[in-house]
UniProtKB/Swiss-Prot annotation:
Gene ablation phenotype (knockout): No visible effect on senescence.
Tissue spec. comment: Found in senescent leaves, especially in senescence-associated vacuoles- (SAVs) containing cells (e.g. mesophyll and guard cells), and in senescencing ovules of unfertilised pistils.
Protein's UniProt name: Senescence-specific cysteine protease SAG12
Family: Belongs to the peptidase C1 family.
Glycosylated residues in this chain: 124, 301
Keywords noted in UniProt: Apoptosis, Disulfide bond, Glycoprotein, Hydrolase, Hypersensitive response, Plant defense, Protease, Signal, Thiol protease, Vacuole
Active site: 154, 289, 310
Keyword Hydrolase: yes
A cellular component term, taken from the record's GO annotations: senescence-associated vacuole
UniProt biotechnology annotation: Good molecular marker for age-induced senescence onset measurement.
Signal sequence segment: 1-25
Length: 346
């Protein structure tokens, strides 16, 4: 009898030890899998760190971001968009915001309230006459997605994209224009430290226009203005107009006629890792980024959206673009996209 009890005791002890070892191994296995994912991500995005300490620190950030992305994507209902582990996955949200935005929105809005409102040429366009959907890519008025890198000159990319579109609509030629010319030569803005599309339009009008991207290529950093490279001019503008503030219907009228530069709050976590679908994520109306509205439409489930062209490369979003919810309850628009919009005139 004693022998039988001893056998039972040994079996329980061995089984308990086995279960305990499995329990311990699971977190270890998960950690190894995550480390492998980080290494694969580094290879995919060409990320090289200065030393082991930096790599370890970036791994922790990467892990936290991945876990949060996967948690948010697992929410079963109410989310019409997905997030992805993209090229920004080893950056904290604060780091991302400081490196990849650059719209001087707060100062722009405060000064706008003190100035006379500009004319709006589409004011009398009947809403009923507007097309149900617009996509300027299909009409040949949008150049391929560009990448501002870690230079905070989104304002320049937004302004240039709007001018590229207006030029194609007016002259029938789609020309890739120079953002670097604005970064280097527009002294009313701040290069990689940020700027505003309206002041960029003013600079372009005053200096006679923009040259091509190939003539004055993008470097992703501030440099001295090379006046020789600013010529010959590929296009010019007569000025710009602001879209009435906090009015998505007015914005729709403008976008139906041409691509429009738009200020937006693009520094949030959901925006950082947006991958696909109609964006309805968390954001504020503190404008910190600039994009270009190039269309609008409605998905098969009835979700209305804007199409925006970003300047973070093709690995972000829907090959560099985002569909973001349109006609929301808040008059400012989702992420404030109806607060500060403007377009060039040719």
């Amino acid at each position: 009898m004693a022998l039988k009890h001893m056998q039972i005791f040994l079996f329980v002890a061995i089984f308990s030890s086995f279960c305990f070892s499995i329990t311990l191994s699971r977190p270890l296995d998960n950690e190894l899998i995550m480390q492998k994912r980080h290494i694969e991500w580094m290879t995919k995005h060409g990320r090289v760190y200065a030393d082991v300490k930096e790599e370890n620190n970036r791994y922790v950030v990467f892990k936290n971001n991945v876990e949060r992305i996967e948690h948010l994507n697992s929410i079963p209902a109410g989310r019409t968009f997905k997030l992805a582990v993209n090229q920004f996955a080893d950056l904290t949200n604060d780091e991302f915001r400081s490196m990849y935005t650059g719209f001087k929105g707060v100062s722009a809005l405060s000064s706008q309230s003190q100035t006379k409102m500009s004319p709006f040429r589409y004011q009398n366009v009947s809403s009923g006459a507007l097309p149900v959907s617009v996509d300027w890519r299909k009409k040949g008025a949008v150049t391929p997605i560009k990448n501002q890198g870690s230079c905070g000159c989104c304002w320049a990319f937004s302004a240039v994209a709007a001018i590229e579109g207006a030029t194609q609509i007016k002259k029938g030629k789609l020309i890739s224009l120079s953002e670097q010319q604005l970064v280097d030569c527009d002294t009313n803005d701040f290069g990689c430290e940020g700027g505003l599309m309206d002041t960029a339009f003013e600079h372009i009008k005053a200096t006679g226009g923009l040259t091509t991207e190939s003539n004055y290529p993008y470097k992703g950093e501030d440099a001295t203005c090379n006046s020789k490279k600013t010529n010959p001019k590929a296009t010019s503008i007569t000025g710009y107009e602001d879209v009435p503030v906090n009015d998505e219907q007015a914005l729709m009228k403008a976008v139906a006629h041409q691509p429009v530069s738009v200020g937006i709050e693009g520094g949030g976590f959901d925006f950082q890792f947006y991958s696909s679908g109609v964006f309805t994520g968390e954001c504020t109306t503190y404008l910190d980024h600039a994009v270009t509205a190039i269309g609008y439409g409605e998905s098969t489930n009835g979700s209305k959206y804007w199409i925006i062209k970003n300047s973070w490369g093709t690995k972000w979003g829907e090959s560099g673009y985002m569909r973001i919810q349109k006609d929301v309850k808040d008059k400012q628009g989702l992420c404030g996209l109806a607060m500060k919009a403007s377009y060039p005139t040719i």
